[in-house]
Amino acid sequence: MAGWVRLKTGLTVIPGLLLALGAGAGARSGEQAGNRHATVVVFAAASLTDCLKEIATGYEKATGDKIVFNLAASSTLARQIRAGARADVFFSADEARMQALEDEGLIAKGTRRSRLSNSLVIVVAADRGAEVKSPQDLAGPKIKRLALADPQAVPAGVYAREYLRRVKLWSAIQPKVVPMENVRAALAAVEAGNVDAGIVYKTDVAISRKVRIAWEAPRQEGPLISYPMALLADAPQPQAGRRFLEHLSSGQAEAVFRKFGFIVLESSVP
């Protein structure tokens, strides 16, 4: 299993496209052969990493199915799916990526639902962070480098750019932006002291003791953040994928999402 990342929980994370292709091909043969337990390949936004690991651990123990994750920026995952990567479930951090795939016929009809929401926060280092009380402070001289997930492609960065444009700060802040591969990379840059501040999801802060929230976007003013999930049209394991989607809509999964700070958008299935 060279090249795969084995987590202490027993879950497996696929770091790249080629492994996703291989996992999908093998999984289809397992379902067609009528195997009792299936391997479900889930492409999910990086900001969902911790809650999905916990949900999957319990699900694996209860069902015997195996959940394999490819965790990255939603834009990266969408490109991989378009390129032919085989996966069962896509859990995106924005509606735009999901809609684009649905328009191309890559999403199974009737399976898409918006599950979660989040909020944007400005974070600084917990021990030596710059004094930031509002987005306007990001335009000041104390902030020279600001970490964002790529504002041209990655949902967290796109949401941040949209908000800063709305409050007429983007033109002043854009020269300071250090674009990162995904939102967790932006968080890591703040933790390491490589930037003065960052804009990430509120849920990302829950996993770090090295940063603190300096400001949170009010829900009535901030961008509308929505995490949709769906079965892929060419899922190698459609039945098992549907079962896992149903579990993600359960009250048990909702409790985990809330534990990690997500806002649940729909009523859960008991």
What are these regions (language model features)?
Residues G10-G22:
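Bacterial N-terminal signal peptides
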Residues G22-A85, S92-E95, Q99-G105, T111-P270:
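Exported/periplasmic ABC-transporter solute-binding proteins
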Residues K8-L11, A62:
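Intrinsically disordered/low-complexity terminal segments and short unstructured peptides
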Residues M1-R6:
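N-terminal secretory signal peptides that target proteins for export/translocation
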